[in-house]
């Protein structure tokens, strides 16, 4: 296991974490590579233009599929929420709503990022009692 691994999993808000809606594949690929540290691993033209990016074995994809980016995004499970926050803030990304959520009895330290394309990302990490904030 790579001790530098940060991304553990990604889950879609709507239908498909490999087809999040964007209007410009090239712009999306460049931004997510620079800001989220993703690497382009696949580009498709059929059935719609799409690009698949990856970090730490976790894949997130973007497609020109007519979807509404403002109603979509992904929940990204990370191994170190504080490191994820520092990394993104260090690149000038505004972090929103740093808080503790509870889901099915599990506390999660979370924050949100709204990307320039309108997609929303919910970064989260399970925490134990006494580890809040």
Language-model-derived ranges and their functions:
Residues 31, 82-87:
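Short amphipathic alpha-helices within nucleic acid-binding modules
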Residues 68-72, 129-132:
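A short local loop/turn or secondary-structure capping micro-motif enriched for an aromatic residue
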Residues 1-11, 17-20, 41, 52, ...:
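Vicinal oxygen chelate
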Residues 15-16, 71-73:
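Eukaryotic phosphotyrosine signaling hubs
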Residues 20, 74-76:
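Short, well-ordered beta-strand elements within core beta-sheets of diverse protein domains
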Residues 24-25, 78-82:
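Helix N-cap motif at beta-to-alpha junctions
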């Amino acid at each position: 296991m790579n001790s530098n691994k940060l991304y553990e999993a990604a889950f879609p808000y709507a239908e498909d974490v490999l087809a999040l809606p964007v209007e410009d594949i090239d712009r999306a690929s460049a931004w997510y590579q620079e800001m989220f540290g993703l690497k382009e691993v696949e580009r498709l033209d059929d059935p719609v233009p799409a690009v698949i990016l990856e970090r730490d074995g976790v894949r997130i994809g973007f497609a020109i599929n007519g979807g509404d980016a403002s109603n979509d995004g992904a929940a990204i499970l990370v191994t170190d929420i504080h490191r994820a926050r520092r990394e993104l803030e260090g690149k000038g990304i505004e972090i929103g709503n740093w808080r503790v959520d509870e889901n099915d009895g599990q506390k999660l330290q979370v924050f949100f990022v709204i990307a320039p394309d309108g997609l929303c990302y919910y970064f989260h990490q399970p925490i134990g009692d006494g580890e809040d904030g």
